[in-house]
């Protein structure tokens, strides 16, 4: 896990002002498309992660560890939504280098 990856996940969560519109699936897709665009333009990805095929789309292999790290550092809060989805709340501004 690199710091840019952790910061990017925190940044996306922070910029989504309505947590009910950003669940795990959308977060994963944002990361996938970001990696895809950067790969085409620079031949590198932001996350450096591999993606695992899941029923609802590709999932970054290390996303759970990233989210747990952000939550343990009190940078985000993760809660369950009404339909058993995950809701992400940013508790502090993300570090942008």
Question: Which residues fall in each region the model found?
Answer:
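Domain-edge interaction signal
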Residues: 1-97
């Amino acid at each position: 896990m690199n710091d840019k990856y952790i910061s990017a996940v925190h940044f996306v969560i922070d910029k989504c002002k309505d947590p009910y519109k950003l669940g795990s699936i959308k977060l994963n897709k944002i990361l996938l498309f970001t990696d895809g665009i950067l790969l085409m333009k620079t031949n590198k990805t932001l996350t450096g992660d591999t993606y695992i095929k899941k029923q609802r789309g590709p999932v970054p292999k290390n996303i759970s560890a990233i989210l747990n790290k952000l939550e343990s550092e009190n940078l985000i809060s993760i809660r369950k939504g009404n339909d058993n989805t995950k809701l992400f709340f940013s508790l502090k501004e993300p570090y942008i280098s």
